[in-house]
């Protein structure tokens, strides 16, 4: 009786009519139809959130697209078949022009660390704006030195001197220049599949053809990528590091300026370096007179969960650390931190950055550090990220389309392949899944050289319920393929 009542209720709720006399539909077909309808109604449910945005009265998506095409660079591109018009954001959620809420699992490309519009960061910026937002570092202001002091307290060894920039590209440009000035050498080693920026020197260090223009990019040698999934030596980090030795011996004078590498490759598809690689590579480079640069633009600021800085999980201490993105929670800010000895090379000439270290940005950065500490977001990234990775791994066991699940904390990657043995990139399937997940309220990023990797880098306030919702949506979308 209860089953019949439930079926009748389902039929009524979906405006189904029982077949009239003479209908060709069989009882089995009717039961199948009910089951399909019941399945369709069981879409994953987004966790509750105590905020609703006010009505949006700005330009429509169509108007924005028209202006973008007319006035902005044609190099700009967007995700999704139907572009998303984001008009407001709170913590781990963003809202479109219709007030619809989405779970942001991309975090502005690993940039939103504390959460969208975190009140502590917003209040610090507003407070500073009411005092002074910019003058010049030629005058004194306590915000830049206060933030620098707090920042170096998170770093090991003799990493005690800070230079502020506006972006990760700027930070890496400065770091590479300092390495060359300090050593008196020009050659730098970076990794294949890496991304370090798109200016003159950093484009040379970047090693993906789809991010490189045909301009002069001299003095950089790209070593074999220590990729445990696609690499030729599997997870043997020391074997990969031998290529750094060979590059130095056969491609340079035997002396180099340095090595630059991400702790986890971000744009390259959330690739964790093979265990043992960085200690071996650092040792080889230092024996050749070079310094070691850790690019922490994406993996820094507690994102990997187990450590505040990504390089710490490899057991190394760099000579120079670069950072951006999560440092300001969306405010344009970057930095280079190095030793007093290396920092001294910039005193040979005048070095200046107009906006680097301005009061507003450094007030934001200082607030980010406070929030990360007070709200224990590193611990949260470890807890939620570990849970999310476990659930994604279970999903891999369910679907052949998933070739690899990797990463640490809330910096995770899911690589899609058409064939697990051949590892043929499933680029079209990746795009389709992204679109389907967006329709169900989940936003993820995309990366990897072949464009077949989900980049999952949400704000660090991401919850266990958010993680479950993401996986449930992904599971539902994949079940329909």
From Swiss-Prot:
Keywords: Aminotransferase, Mitochondrion, Photorespiration, Pyridoxal phosphate, Transferase, Transit peptide
EC numbers on record: 2.6.1.44
Record-linked Pfam families: Aminotran_3
PTM annotation (N6-(pyridoxal phosphate)lysine): residues: 325
Tagged with keyword Transferase: yes
GO MF assignments: alanine-glyoxylate transaminase activity; pyridoxal phosphate binding
Basic and acidic residues: compositionally biased ranges: 33-43
Protein name: Alanine--glyoxylate aminotransferase 2 homolog 3, mitochondrial
Source species of the chain: Arabidopsis thaliana
């Amino acid at each position: 009786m209860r089953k019949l009542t439930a079926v009748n209720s389902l039929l009524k709720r979906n405006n189904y009519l029982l077949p009239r006399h003479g209908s060709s539909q069989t009882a089995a077909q009717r039961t199948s139809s009910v089951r399909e309808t019941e399945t369709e109604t069981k879409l994953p449910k987004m966790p509750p959130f105590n905020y609703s945005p006010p009505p949006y009265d700005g330009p429509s998506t169509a108007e924005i697209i028209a202006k973008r095409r007319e006035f902005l660079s044609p190099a700009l591109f967007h995700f999704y078949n139907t572009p998303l018009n984001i008009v407001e954001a709170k913590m781990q959620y963003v809202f479109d022009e219709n007030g619809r809420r989405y779970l942001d699992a991309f975090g502005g490309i690993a940039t939103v660390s504390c959460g969208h519009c975190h009140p502590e960061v917003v209040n610090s910026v507003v407070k500073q704006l009411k005092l002074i937002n910019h003058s010049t570092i030629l005058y004194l202001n306590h915000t830049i030195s206060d933030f620098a002091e707090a920042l170096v307290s998170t770093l090991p060894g003799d990493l005690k001197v800070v230079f502020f920039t506006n972006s990760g590209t700027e930070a890496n440009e400065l770091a590479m220049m300092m390495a060359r000035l300090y050593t008196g050498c020009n050659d730098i080693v970076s990794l294949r599949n890496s991304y370090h920026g798109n200016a003159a020197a950093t484009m040379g260090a970047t090693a993906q053809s789809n991010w490189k223009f045909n301009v002069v990019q001299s003095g950089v040698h790209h070593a074999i990528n220590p990729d445990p999934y696609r690499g030729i030596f599997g997870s043997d980090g020391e074997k990969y590091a031998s290529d750094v030795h060979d590059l130095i011996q056969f491609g340079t004078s035997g002396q180099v300026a340095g090595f630059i590498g991400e702790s986890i490759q971000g744009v390259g598809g959330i690739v964790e370096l093979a265990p043992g690689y960085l200690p071996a590579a650092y040792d080889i480079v230092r024996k050749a007179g070079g310094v070691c640069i850790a690019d922490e633009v994406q993996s820094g600021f507690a994102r990997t969960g187990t450590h505040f800085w990504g390089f710490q999980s490899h057991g190394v201490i760099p000579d120079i650390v670069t950072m951006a993105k999560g440092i300001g929670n969306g405010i344009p800010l970057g930095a280079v931190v190095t030793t007093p000895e290396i920092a001294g090379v910039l005193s040979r000439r005048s070095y200046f950055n107009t906006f680097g270290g301005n009061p507003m940005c450094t007030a934001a950065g200082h607030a980010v550090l406070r929030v990360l500490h007070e709200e224990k977001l590193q611990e949260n990234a470890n807890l939620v990220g570990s849970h999310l990775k476990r659930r994604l791994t279970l999903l891999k066991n369910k679907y052949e389309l998933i070739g690899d699940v990797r990463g640490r904390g809330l910096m995770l990657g899911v690589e899609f392949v058409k064939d697990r043995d051949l590892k043929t990139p499933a680029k079209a399937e990746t795009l389709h899944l992204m679109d389907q997940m967006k329709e169900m309220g989940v936003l993820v990023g995309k990366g990897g050289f072949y464009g077949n990797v989900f980049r999952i880098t949400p704000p660090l306030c991401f919850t266990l319920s958010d993680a479950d919702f993401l996986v449930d949506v992904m599971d539902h979308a994949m079940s329909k393929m």
